[in-house]
């Protein structure tokens, strides 16, 4: 087992007490209540997430980014969004490379929590996109022109939902074949 894999597994263990939820601009934690998310959400810093113990994938990826950076492991982060004119589901996730293999590190998406190994980045991205489509988009409603994938860099903390979308959409567009 490589050092990167050991560190990634240690992070999964460290994140066990972090729940899927969000913190609003007043500092109130919301678990399971997303009614005011689009108006009141603000992106947390890693220290804030560690304190609140609740974050959506956007917050959790920033915590993960910080952890991997502290351990000198190069990573990339990706933003998936399906612009359907309604709820516009999203997912962010982190990828790293170890010993020639690519790894999808996943904590927030509980169904797929863990480390997932791939031969190349295209295989990894395609798999995550297919899982996202199958899990988040109703059968028959999928239109590939509405799905966007961007690689993005570290955002400023405190961004609103709209600001976070705009930031990620300004990242590097990734063309994924379905």
Residue ranges and their predicted role:
Residues 1-178:
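A structural boundary/capping signal
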